[in-house]
Structure formats: structure tokens, C-alpha cells
Amino acid sequence: MDNLNVFANEDNQVNDVKPPPPPPRVCARCDSDNTKFCYYNNYCEFQPRYFCKNCRRYWTHGGALRNIPIGGSSRAKRARVNQPSVARMVSVETQRGNNQPFSNVQENVHLVGSFGASSSSSVGAVGNLFGSLYDIHGGMVTNLHPTRTVRPNHRLAFHDGSFEQDYYDVGSDNLLVNQQVGGYGYHMNPVDQFKWNQSFNNTMNMNYNNDSTSGSSRGSDMNVNHDNKKIRYRNSVIMHPCHLEKDGP
């Protein structure tokens, strides 16, 4: 029994010992001696695989030589060129595009200032403000178009009276001068026009009565002076702000 165990141990030791590497061989392609053994192909001792340091190619002893270019199997690390990624470039362009409309909004807000200074320029600035808000982001002002009609949430006060406007065109540059705003026509309220005319006539009559009771008789020239004064007064008087009503569908 003991003899059997000794033979078994000797067989295991013999099997565990690796065979010595084959001697270096000359390169089959360039005939260079600067070669080294790498491994056995398919774990077969009859197919040792070598590497030539001169032409930097592999070959198997006793096997066919493949047409491999010089240095084709080299895995040297190549220097990478730092190029900006596409996502980073898109994000930069998006930020650049979003910052520009906000600058326009700030300029328009600065131009609006007080509405009493200039009615036409202020309302035009409001129109440009809404146009810039539409360009910022489609989700923020989804249903608002620069050329559509919107309804204001407040009234604009000019001079001493109040100017009420039910609809105005956001995309228009001068909203008060145009006769049609947002596709709707506007006309003066007959009641307000009658009151203004009556007030104007009363003022003229009072001036005429004062001139007639002053004791100075001008004869036929009084009517001419009265007409000239009336024309000058009409040109110099500032029309009282009135209410505009919507005339349209």
C-alpha cells in the first residue's frame, strides 16, 4: 500500500511541473533574433507562439504566416484630443439663446417707465415686451402669439383721465395711432363727445359774454375776432381723455 502511494505522489509531482520554455527562434518574417516566447497556441507544446520586437508582429512556429502589417498588433496608448462633447456645445448654445431675450425684456421694462410720459412709446414698449416673452420659451407663453389680440388685466392711466382699452395688439409698434387695433375698430362714445362739445361751447359763450359786457363796442369786427379766437382756442385746447368703445365682432 505504501509503495502505491509513493508512486502516486511521484506522478502528481511530475504532472505539476511545467515544461521548460522553448528556445528563442528567429523571426519568420524579418529574420530578427530579437524575439520572445509568449505562450503555447491552444495549449499545445508543438505550437509555440512568439513575438518579434523588431517588426512587432506575432507568429506561430510551424504555422502559416498571415499578412499582418508592421506594427498592426501594437496596442500603444494614443494621445486623445480633448474635444468638447456635443451635449456641452448644445447646452452652451441654449444658454446663449435664452440670455438674449431676457436682455431685451429688461430694456423694454426700462423703456416703459411711467405711462404718463409718452403714451404711444410706452404702449409700443409693452407690445415689444410681450413679443420678447414669447421668444423666451414656448412653454411659458404657449397660446400667446405676438400678432394675436389679448385682453389686458388693468387699465392704463394717461394725463388726468383714464384711458380704457378693451383689446390691444401685442405685436403692433404704435397701438394708439392705428385706427384698428387687433382687428377691432374703435370710435368715440357719442355721450362723451356731446359732453365735450357742450363744455367747449359753454366756455366759448362765457368768453363771448365777458367780452360783450366789458363795455367796449367793436362793431362788425367783434364777430371776426370771436371766430379767430374760437379757432385759436380750439387749436390750443387739449382734448379731454375720453372712453373708447369696441366696434367690431
Swiss-Prot record:
Residues where Zn(2+) binds: C27, C30, C52, C55
- Stored InterPro entries: Dof (IPR045174), Znf_Dof (IPR003851)
Tell me where it mainly resides. nucleus
Q: Which UniProt keywords apply?
A: DNA-binding, Metal-binding, Nucleus, Transcription, Transcription regulation, Zinc, Zinc-finger
GO biological-process terms attached to the record:
regulation of DNA-templated transcription
Zinc fingers (Dof-type), renumbered ranges: 25-79
Keyword check for Hydrolase: no
Subcellular location per the Swiss-Prot or TrEMBL entry: Nucleus
Kindly list the GO molecular function terms attached to this UniProt entry. DNA binding; DNA-binding transcription factor activity; zinc ion binding
Keyword Cell inner membrane among UniProt keywords: no
Could you tell me which Pfam families the record lists for this protein? Answer: Zn_ribbon_Dof (PF02701)
Q: Which GO terms describe its cellular component?
A: nucleus
Q: What does this protein do?
A: Transcription factor that binds specifically to a 5'-AA[AG]G-3' consensus core sequence.
Q: What is this protein called?
A: Dof zinc finger protein DOF4.5
